[in-house]
């Protein structure tokens, strides 16, 4: 894949996600069709399916798992597993290009309001947990400790993200996520 086609792919995915979120917020998730999303983005419905396998995926896919796993892998191996995961997640939050706060807020609100999307969110979180755990296990951490550390960190981030999205406060998303990791770091040091 060339740089041009990679850029075009990313641009098309972003157009589809923006169009979907706009339509979901205007007319509701259930009332919005893939055809409407594609038309709003200026592409065919087949192009939609080249980028997202389902309507759910346009909300749930974020592509951060590889970046998160790489950030945890880059964290110092001498740390306790939970601390290492927190260090890696902090690095990922700093270095990964996150979508705008309002886009994240809208995506999470839409996902929280629909049982199918909530289930998909849990499945995506499990995939992220597994990616983090695999990194830790590869460096000699027991599978049990690796799964507990990754699950604890992602549970903290999930709580922080949901509370941030559902609040009326204008604090930055990154501050809320960092505060959740602070709780875990303090717990790990005790």
Please annotate each region the language model reported.
Residues 1-27, 31-43, 60, 71:
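Basic, helix-initiating cap at the start of DNA-binding domains
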